[in-house]
Amino acid sequence: MLAAVFICLTGVSQPRFSKENEQRAAEIVSQMTLQEKAEYVGGFEDWYIRAIERLGLPAVRMADGPQGVRNNTKSTLYPSGIAAAATWDTDLIHQMGIALGQDARARGVHILLGPGANIYRSPLCGRNFEYFGEDPYLAGEIAASYIIGVQSQGVMASVKHFAANNQEYARHSVSSDVDERTLHEIYFPAFEKAVKKAEVATVMTSYNLLNSVHASESKYLNYDVLRDMWGFKGLVMSDWISCYSPLNIATWGVDLEMPSPICMTPELLVEYVKNGTLAEEYLDRKCQHIIQTIFAFDFDKRPQLDKSIPENNPYSDSVALEISRGAIVMLKNQDNFLPVKKGNFFVCGPNAGKIVTGGGSGFVTPIITSTVSQAMTSIDKKVKATVISDKAKTKIDGMYADRSMSIPGVSVELYSNVNLEGEPVSRYVSDKVFLSGKPAEAHEDVVASRLSSRHTFYFTPEVDVTYVLKINGNDGCRFYINGELKDSAWGRDSWQYITTEYDFKAGHQYEVVVEHYNRGGTNGLELIFDSPVLVNESEAEKIKAADCVVVCIGHDNTSEKENHDRTFELPKEHIEYLRSVLALSDNVVVVLNGGGGIEMGSWLPDVKAVLMAWYPGQQGGTAISEIITGKVSPSGKLPISIEARLEDNPSYKHYYENVPRMRVPSINPYSRLEYREGIFMGYRGYEKNDVKPLYPFGYGLSYTSFEYTDLQILQDGREYVVSFNIKNVGKVAGAEIAQVYVTDDECSVLRPEKELKGFDKVFLKPGETKRVSIKLGDEAFRFYDLNRHDFTVEPGSFTISVASSSADIRLTGKLEVLAIDK
């Protein structure tokens, strides 16, 4: 059970947009000078809306989310967004929002840059872990609960990234080409619910283009949909460095350019207004939106920093633990191997001894750490655990910049183009393979956002040594050893991660060359030397003797992160480690980390159990150990479908690896990703294509069983109430997530076989029965009509399915929907 809310904030009214606040804002705008307006629509010192003291406008501070308040200090690290969705528990996610709001107030933060509400389209997207899964209804309900919680504490939430940001590949230059119906039925609803149900304060646009127009300057997104269709009253901000055309941004683009006025510079805006290119009313409108949002939260009337809230808030920690408990999905439990309440445990694997999380702006350094190895040994002192120490380093002894090995370091050549063409414009020696931004040694012609580089060093080991060479680079990278290409991610145009294991022989000289280019965005490159993950002799004996071997593997912040699409497969060294353990034991439980689907077919038949732990936050180790030992019954269910093969995913043929990249600037300066699967993505697509996923949407095992009975469907005005009984027929307490799907039995347009339209998480003691009621309104039966450019409901027969997962229907019934008067 959650502890009571630690702090009850005083003096903070429920945030609201009102005519009074709009009028106050208009009065302030009327007093602003043109220069002040031009400056106000650009960020200040990277993380602020600037203050205008003479008008009583405060500085407004932002911080990254959404897994915690990322503020250059330690903070509570919550489970990732996809883990939050896996709880299917809106009450709990509301508590998460409250806790995040308190964390923000404890640090004086006004705007939390979260949640992320993009839809999971493919397992490859590097930021899936931040989002709420593949279903728009589930994502919308989780997002709204999160936002309402955050904003109840006097902190603005910022729902992101609007819209169709479903890949990190080439995110500055890729156009998500999505048809109108698919946008409104799949990719818009979570944002719509954030606006209409949660009254979110701010919306952040995405880096990508939507149908050939950058989101940050799209009139369709920022005005036609957000404001005219949904009635949004708040402010729209850009993602960091995602504004491209000054005049387009100034007219129909975002209200606020972050992190600073790089595109909409004050000088340019003032010039545009004075020469008649831009009407001043456009700036008035942007300032109006920003100021009325500030007034809605009373930021001008109270301090945001609340010193009565500790940064290490016990309530926040308890919420993080409860979410982790509810998020973990048990995918496999052969012969009821789990729970193992007594016996000889051995805990191992690359992720056993560390807090595992995704990378990028969602990365948070936790205040408290509970790893799996720590938690398992604290539960039972007899538990043996091996923590694989981090032996990674960015430089090794004996690196030389020349073949004669007289100059220590790495030879670096920089080019003022992205193709390593012509002569390098800068040459220098570095102590390692590393770039961040524009190097101090770079020639003035080098632009960090458009360059290429070659890094060369020579190495003669004194003894045989094996290194796992890992390269992170933006946008493309590749490397050679003695002239032979060893790995490449060239031409992908996003942050890349490549890795190769190589045996270096004593006395042999090796030439290592790393090449890289950056076509846009943040420039970065790093070569890491790591050691292979191996089972040593001591571990082997413990593995053989153990009744239960817990192997912790998966992705982390190096392989799954912002600005980088990941692989469907696990890191190679993790797979090799698991195989070495499986050669020694038949009693293996795999704890998986990741933000989505992972290839499992090569090892799944050989393990006893699999727990999908996602990125479980700072208390993840505790929750995992409690489930393994039976103190908690697993209750999470998949907010995604997990495919057996990547090729099975409905978007596979239309994701980047199968779409030609067009890069002729005079014709098309960006890539086009056509969402040809349309509305048939996720479980909708698997069912239409008659493809069985490895694990279906809504699936998750428990230590107990549940029985569904007595379905009733009653009409209540314009709503229908679907009610039924759920009984815990097992011997332990547990929670079941009942799911209600709706099928349109006959429609004038092609619709999915069924769609999720309601759910409830029900906690039951052994033998206990509860009556569950779920209401279905117009939203449950509608589809987007392209002729009307609006949603419509066709009268007729609908099938109601009550299910334990999308593939496990327990009860069905029928209802008739009559014509609905608009």
Predicted regions and their residues:
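Glycoside hydrolase catalytic-domain context in secreted enzymes
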Residues: 8-468, 472-786, 792-806, 821
